Amino acid sequence: LCWRDSTHPQGGGSERYLERVGEYLASQGHEVVFRTSKHMNAAHREVRDGVRYSRGGAKFGVYPRAWAAMLAGRLGLGDLRGVDAVIDTQNGIPFFARLVSGAPTVLLTHHCHREQWPVAGPLLGRLGWFLESRVAPRVYRGAPYVTVSEASRQDLEALGIKGAHIIANGLDPVPDHVPSLEREAEVHLVTLSRLVPHKQIEHAMDTVAQTPGAVLDVIGSGWWEAVSYTHLTLPT
């Protein structure tokens, strides 16, 4: 379960991580269903690299639609019937699948979102952090947790979640033929991410601006893009 997949306009590394895990499991003979939101022009159902994608609901509707799909699955109906295990991805808040799936459930979270929730506004931000920091740990008490780094595990421990397993992010294989580029500067940096406030790309811009002769390539897009570009013109 994940709120987006990599074909979503706002999909990113979290979604790619889960897809790669799913593709590996599918290659080992397991049946993998990736339940996610239905974004514009996306099919309700498709199979990609051995993984079956099942979509329904938008930004907020994805959660109740997933609950309905899991409940239907317990009755032997729909895409989620016969499920042996569930991976519930917590992108701020989880699906709380443990309450409705009827199957062993693992909670996957890349990091805590304490610093990100204010972007959602004062009311929604407080509600989101309450669900993430207070409700989810109670619902998932005793369930396996997976995260991607020691820093994230320590953040989980601060919320009372002990013993989270670390499965680090991987890398896709390097292509056999990589073009060779001439060095443009003594210091050449690259950022690769969605352009949203909490990625703090402006920190890299400020650092490079203070380093004579340095070059920075900003790769990515997002709703914060115009603000990031405006930052380039501001005096440092």
Regions found by a protein language model. Give the residues of each.
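Conserved donor-binding/catalytic core segment of Leloir-type glycosyltransferases
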Residues: 146, 180-199, 205-217
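Short donor-sugar binding/catalytic loops of nucleotide-sugar-dependent glycosyltransferases
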Residues: 4-6, 192-196, 201, 222-223
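Short N-terminal targeting/anchoring amphipathic segment
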Residues: 55, 71-95, 100, 106
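N-terminal strand-loop element at the rim of the active site
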Residues: 2-6, 24-60
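Membrane-proximal helix-turn-helix segments that form the acceptor-binding/catalytic region
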Residues: 123-145, 154
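Active-site proximal beta-strand in glycosyltransferases
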Residues: 85-87, 100-118, 125-128, 146
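Conserved small/polar residues in nucleotide/adenosyl-binding loops
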Residues: 230-236
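Carbohydrate-associated surface elements
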Residues: 151, 170
